[in-house]
Regions:
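Cytoplasmic-side transmembrane-helix entry/capping segments in multi-pass membrane proteins
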Residues: 134-145, 165-168, 189-200, 241-250, ...
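Internal active-site segments that recognize and position negatively charged phosphoryl groups
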Residues: 181, 185-259
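C-terminal ends of transmembrane helices
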Residues: 121-134, 175-190, 227-240, 279-292
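C-terminal transmembrane helix-loop-helix hairpin of multi-pass membrane proteins
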Residues: 53-56, 238-319
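Intrinsically disordered, low-complexity repeat regions that act as multivalent interaction hubs
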Residues: 1-72
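Structural signature of hydrophobic alpha-helical transmembrane segments
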Residues: 102-119, 159-174, 209-226, 264-276
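Central hydrophobic cores of alpha-helical transmembrane segments in multi-pass inner-membrane proteins
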Residues: 98, 116-126, 146-150, 173-177
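N-terminal membrane topogenic signal
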Residues: 79-93
Length: 319
């Protein structure tokens, strides 16, 4: 019988496996060192959302700088002078309001009452904002109500008794402001500061009633003189030169408008006196890094309100 042999296993070809291993030998391992953009993005967002330290958080970059920084804040940060003058736009509004007072004075007291009430309201609001107290609805309403009460008192008493009507209203409103501040639960220093601001706002708004008590010719000259003086003061000139130009321009306006009325050349004195008070009010509205809101309230109204007593007194004396 012929011997039988078991089949011997045949070796498998290794070339294809070796080629595949060679092709994958230098491929990077999957899942170990590949970049992870999804994980990096939240990390970057977290880093951006959490600024270093306790420093201030800044807004997004803009082409023209940070729009939230006002001129007053920039001047304070740079250590510049706290005096920032209102500029030409508030001066133009002051001139417009002054010309309205001058134009409506010849229409009678009720015609004059419309721009006067606007002046008194802006005066009360501007003084509170100038003192950094905002919102101050109660104080503004109190000062404006005092001005309206003074207007009614002058209309009821007549121009002959206008000083008593104005001073009486002012005394009542000072007492009322004191009572309201005593009822406040704020700190003593804060109450005193609020009392002074309330009394000053009411006083300035009430004093503006002097236009209602002054002769119509004096109101016409005074309103025109203040308008010209404030515009001249806002010209791009050195401070001393602009003051001189403003006073001379106001005196010239007084002569021009006085020539149309019974005051004549005496209008120069009234115009110069009104301009001096207007420039004081203009300077007050420029103090302590004022904002644009201050410029468009106190900067508009204070020159005219400050000139009202002089317009009344010189109008009575020269008329």
């Amino acid at each position: 019988q012929a011997p039988s042999y078991a089949p011997q296993p045949q070796p498998q070809p290794q070339a294809p496996a070796s080629a595949a291993a060679a092709e994958t030998a230098y491929l990077p391992p999957v899942g170990q060192h590949a970049p992870q953009p999804q994980a990096a993005a939240p990390a970057a967002a977290a880093t951006a959302a959490d600024p270093e330290g306790d420093g201030p958080a800044y807004g997004p970059a803009t082409v023209a700088g940070n729009t939230r920084v006002t001129d007053a804040q920039r001047a304070r940060a740079e250590g510049r002078s706290p005096i920032i003058e209102p500029g030409m736009q508030p001066a133009a509004l002051t001139a417009l309001l002054g010309l309205l007072l001058a134009g409506t004075a010849e229409l009678g007291v009720y015609g004059l009452l419309v721009p006067l009430v606007v002046l008194q309201g802006v005066t009360a609001a501007g003084w509170f904002r100038l003192n950094g107290m905002w919102p101050a609805r109660q104080g503004i309403a109190l000062g404006f109500a005092g001005a309206l009460a003074a207007d009614v008192a002058v209309l009821a008493a007549g121009r002959e008794h206008a000083p008593a009507a104005i001073l009486g209203t002012l005394g009542v409103w000072v007492l009322l402001s004191l009572v309201l501040q005593l009822r406040s639960h704020a700190d003593p220093d804060e109450r005193m500061y609020g009392l002074m601001a309330s009394v000053a706002a009411a006083a300035l708004a009430i004093v503006a009633t002097g236009y209602l008590a002054a002769p119509p010719d004096a109101v016409a000259v005074g309103g025109a003189a203040v308008a010209v003086a404030v515009l001249a003061r806002s010209l791009p000139l050195p401070a001393a030169a602009s003051v001189v130009v403003a006073l001379l321009a106001a005196a010239g306006a007084g002569i021009a408008v006085g020539g149309m009325t019974d005051l004549g050349a005496k209008g120069a004195l009234l115009g110069a006196g009104a301009a001096v008070c207007a420039l004081i009010g203009h300077r007050a509205a420029s103090y302590d890094y004022p904002s644009r809101f201050v410029h468009f309230t106190a900067g508009v109204a204070l020159p005219l309100s400050a000139a009202a007593p002089v317009v009344w007194m010189l109008g009575r004396a020269l008329g």
